């Protein structure tokens, strides 16, 4: 980043024609012209930096705003009734009753994780955790959604071990359980992996904190780690279409995290909240101090004056632009009344957290002033910095969309031997094999409140030890489905996350999302994006659960080739008593197995299509969200009817039966004749709205399912044979559970065994 160390507002007025490197900072010609129009002069170096940061896609949502508004338009008053903080805040906050609230959010750290996988992923965890802290909450868990290229791709071999070690190191050091996630391999993510991190926290309803600067004379306090040169340009460079290193210094655009500093910062924040000394608070993440202070000012009822000379630094002779744009981690910014400043400092000192008074709220509405070396380097309207431009970019259905929606030829084995071979091919594939190699590097049970995590439908946490109240969380996405039909793909992601939560017996209450797409300058990508947003928003409305917040990540592409459009959807559910959680492990003794839902011939975008080498074509499975709600109506009030439940998604019934048998080490004897007339279709179709349940009260289950209009089919029984026997029509297929387990569990260690992370317990 090119900087002029003493470029002041006065100097900018005196030197109006100075050439400035705005394009290197991600600004377009018309944006630079607009900034000069707003200021009535050329911007100072610091102003140019702040506008470039705040007008980046990451901070301003300038290409997505026009479409994201649809979430608000489709949210009814009834849906929003329990939302305490929603879209536009650091994280969504949901009132779950008894004076308790839960906050959750998912965010991307894609581009930094490609450049420096360990630190990129680690600071992704740190950043999303601070978003939770900024709502007044205690973080209690994290999850991740990961996408990589093919296993044997050199980039995947480099990036995956670093990403996993970064997530495990930061999360484990924080003492936060990692309660679930997804890892997907597809060629489209080679050169552009996706690292989406989700965090969840708890708070009392009355303890909610928001990001605004209110009350003239109130002080602006910066606390946490010192400000250095790491992360400069993170949102304006790494979050844009190109990566440019600075001319004078090759500043690192990837942040460096210290989880132990963040762990202390969490406790410090919680004590500050408890002491009642915080008026407003904002974390320092993407955009650093520039983003935090300008957002606080824009959201408040006055203006703000910031003194950069008071900012604690860990590098000498940093310019104003560098101080403002630094994305050094583990920092927070708070607004505090003058009488509480001393108490604020005392609490920070108790936790050995560096703190400085760096400014104050003024009575000059919307005026954002920044001083460095005693001179004014920024004098601008805060609202123009915060709001940014709004683009209604061209939207056009791709010319090849009809072609890709035509299902190509697909191999369909019709012999027992062929089906058996296909089954092994699927369970051992990169798409469906065991993720233990990754997940065993995460601590899933630290803090002692994890009820369900390993191989679970959804992560389940106890949040109140007195009442046993808890939450279930799942995050899901399918880029393959979304490429075939973006609207349906987003609805399927919502449906799967919803179904995973329901499978634990929890009642879904809110949705979050992270929308990962290619370049917004590509009309086809913007069509995908708009369709996905509408599919997700309409789906949430149909289900009556609000979208509480989200994140957008654009420019995910290699050259001109975008990734598969990947809308990650997270669903939060509430359990009145976690002791009644439905697990997904088969209990001991004979259990009857039932399939809830209907199986159709649906292989468009399926894993079998991918594994068999048939490419990507056809239409994704049909989805009627009313069917998902009927499943919820069946399972949530009557969790005691079933001993275990496992949703069906990728790999279909065959994958679910395999996982049930593998996890329990038990045999199954099932007849799929009533599921579908074709055994291969019965096993591997990926029809939505299906769950397998185990029960000893089959008659009651069937009666209740029929009463609610849920299709129900008896599959068979569990046993201790160590064999899965599947019949359908004239065919009978037998597979050894031990052999399935070996095929399922060896794929990842064989591909990445040379790069086991430092925190791994895998042998």
From Swiss-Prot:
Top EC class of this enzyme: ligase
Sites where the protein binds substrate: 108-111, 130, 255, 327-329, 553
UniProt pathway annotation: Purine metabolism; IMP biosynthesis via de novo pathway; 5-amino-1-(5-phospho-D-ribosyl)imidazole from N(2)-formyl-N(1)-(5-phospho-D-ribosyl)glycinamide: step 1/2
Entries under CDD domains matching the protein: PurL_repeat1, PurL_repeat2
Binding site for Mg(2+) 1: 107, 551
Disulfide bonds: none
Protein EC: 6.3.5.3
Reaction(s) this enzyme catalyzes, per UniProt: N(2)-formyl-N(1)-(5-phospho-beta-D-ribosyl)glycinamide + L-glutamine + ATP + H2O = 2-formamido-N(1)-(5-O-phospho-beta-D-ribosyl)acetamidine + L-glutamate + ADP + phosphate + H(+)
Gene Ontology biological process: 'de novo' IMP biosynthetic process
Subcellular location field: Cytoplasm
Keyword Zinc-finger among UniProt keywords: no
Keywords: ATP-binding, Cytoplasm, Ligase, Magnesium, Metal-binding, Nucleotide-binding, Purine biosynthesis
Family matches, as InterPro entries: PRibForGlyAmidine_synth_PurL (IPR010074), PurL_linker (IPR041609), PurM-like_C_dom (IPR010918), PurM-like_C_sf (IPR036676), PurM-like_N (IPR016188), PurM-like_N_sf (IPR036921)
Superkingdom in the source lineage: Bacteria
GO molecular function, a single term: phosphoribosylformylglycinamidine synthase activity
Gene Ontology cellular component annotations, sorted alphabetically: cytoplasm
Assembly description: Monomer. Part of the FGAM synthase complex composed of 1 PurL, 1 PurQ and 2 PurS subunits.
Role description: Part of the phosphoribosylformylglycinamidine synthase complex involved in the purines biosynthetic pathway. Catalyzes the ATP-dependent conversion of formylglycinamide ribonucleotide (FGAR) and glutamine to yield formylglycinamidine ribonucleotide (FGAM) and glutamate. The FGAM synthase complex is composed of three subunits. PurQ produces an ammonia molecule by converting glutamine to glutamate. PurL transfers the ammonia molecule to FGAR to form FGAM in an ATP-dependent manner.
Similarity comment: Belongs to the FGAMS family.
Protein name in UniProt: Phosphoribosylformylglycinamidine synthase subunit PurL
Name of the gene: purL
């Amino acid at each position: 980043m090119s900087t002029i160390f003493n470029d002041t507002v006065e100097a900018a007025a005196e030197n109006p024609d100075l050439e400035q490197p705005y394009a290197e900072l991600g600004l377009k010609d018309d944006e630079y012209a607009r900034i000069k129009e707003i200021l009535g002069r050329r911007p100072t170096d610091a102003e140019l930096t702040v506008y470039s940061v705040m007008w980046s896609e990451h901070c301003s949502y300038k290409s997505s705003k026009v479409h994201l508004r649809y979430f608000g338009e489709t949210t009814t008053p009834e849906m929003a009734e329990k939302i305490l903080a929603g879209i536009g805040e650091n994280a969504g906050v949901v009132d779950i009753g008894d004076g308790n609230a839960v906050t959750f959010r998912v965010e991307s750290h894609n581009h930094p994780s490609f450049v420096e996988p360990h630190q990129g992923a680690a600071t992704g965890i740190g950043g999303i955790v601070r978003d939770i802290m900024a709502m007044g909450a205690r973080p209690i868990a994290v999850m991740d959604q990961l996408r990589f290229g093919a296993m044997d791709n050199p980039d995947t071999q480099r990036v995956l071990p670093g990403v996993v070690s970064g997530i495990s190191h930061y999360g484990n050091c924080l003492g936060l359980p990692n309660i679930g996630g997804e890892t997907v391999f597809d060629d489209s993510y080679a050169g552009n992996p996706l690292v989406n991190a989700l965090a969840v926290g708890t708070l009392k309803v009355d303890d909610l904190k928001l990001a605004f600067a209110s009350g003239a004379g109130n002080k602006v306090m910066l606390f946490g780690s010192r400000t250095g040169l790491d992360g400069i340009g993170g949102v304006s460079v790494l979050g844009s279409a190109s990566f440019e290193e600075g001319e004078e210094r090759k500043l690192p655009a990837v942040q460096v995290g210290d989880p132990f500093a963040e762990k202390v910062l969490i406790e410090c924040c919680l004590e500050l909240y408890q002491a009642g000394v915080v008026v407003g608070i904002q974390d320092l993440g993407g955009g650093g101090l520039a983003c935090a202070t300008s957002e606080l000012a824009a959201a408040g009822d006055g203006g703000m004056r910031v003194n950069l000379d008071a900012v604690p630094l860990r590098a000498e002779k940093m310019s104003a632009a560098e101080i403002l744009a630094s994305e050094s981690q583990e920092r927070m910014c708070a607004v505090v009344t003058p009488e509480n400043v001393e108490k604020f400092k005392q609490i920070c000192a108790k936790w050995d957290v560096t703190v400085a008074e760096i400014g104050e709220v003024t009575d000059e509405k919307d005026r954002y002033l920044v001083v460095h070396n005693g001179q004014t380097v920024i004098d601008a309207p805060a609202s123009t910095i915060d709001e940014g431009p709004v683009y209604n970019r061209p939207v056009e259905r791709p010319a090849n969309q009809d072609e890709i929606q035509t299902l190509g030829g697909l191999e369909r084995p019709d012999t027992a031997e062929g089906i058996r071979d296909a089954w092994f091919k699927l369970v051992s594939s990169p798409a469906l094999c065991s993720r233990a190699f990754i997940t065993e590097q995460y601590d899933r049970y630290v803090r002692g409140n994890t009820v369900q995590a390993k191989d679970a439908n959804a992560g389940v946490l106890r949040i109140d030890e007195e009442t046993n109240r808890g939450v279930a969380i799942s995050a899901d996405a399918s880029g393959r489905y979304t490429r075939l039909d973006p609207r349906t793909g987003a609805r399927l992601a919502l449906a799967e996350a919803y179904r995973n939560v329901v499978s634990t017996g929890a009642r879904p209450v809110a949705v979050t999302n992270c929308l990962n797409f290619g370049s917004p300058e590509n009309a086809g990508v913007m069509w995908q994006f708009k369709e996905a947003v509408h599919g997700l928003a309409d789906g949430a409305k149909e289900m009556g659960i609000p979208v509480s917040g989200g994140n957008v990540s654009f420019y995910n592409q290699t050259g001109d080739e975008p990734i598969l459009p990947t809308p990650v959807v997270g669903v939060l559910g509430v359990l009145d008593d976690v002791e009644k959680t439905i697990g997904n492990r088969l209990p001991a003794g004979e259990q009857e197995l039932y399939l809830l839902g209907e199986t159709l011939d649906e292989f468009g975008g399926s894993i079998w299509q991918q594994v068999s080498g048939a490419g990507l074509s056809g239409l994704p499975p049909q989805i009627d969200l009313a069917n998902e709600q009927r499943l919820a109506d069946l399972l949530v009030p009557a969790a005691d009817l079933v001993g275990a439940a496992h949703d069906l998604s990728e790999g279909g019934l065959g994958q679910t039966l395999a996982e049930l048998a593998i996890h329990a080490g038990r045999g199954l004897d099932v007849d799929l004749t009533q599921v579908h007339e074709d055994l291969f279709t019965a096993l591997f179709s990926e029809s939505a709205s299906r769950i397998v349940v185990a029960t000893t009260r089959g008659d009651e289950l069937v009666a209740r399912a029929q009463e609610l209009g849920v299709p129900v089919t008896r599959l068979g029984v569990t046993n201790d044979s160590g064999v899965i026997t599947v019949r359908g029509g004239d065919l009978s297929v037998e597979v050894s559970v031990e052999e399935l387990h070996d095929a399922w569990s060896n794929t990842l260690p064989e591909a990445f065994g040379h790069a086991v992370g430092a925190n791994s317990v895998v042998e």
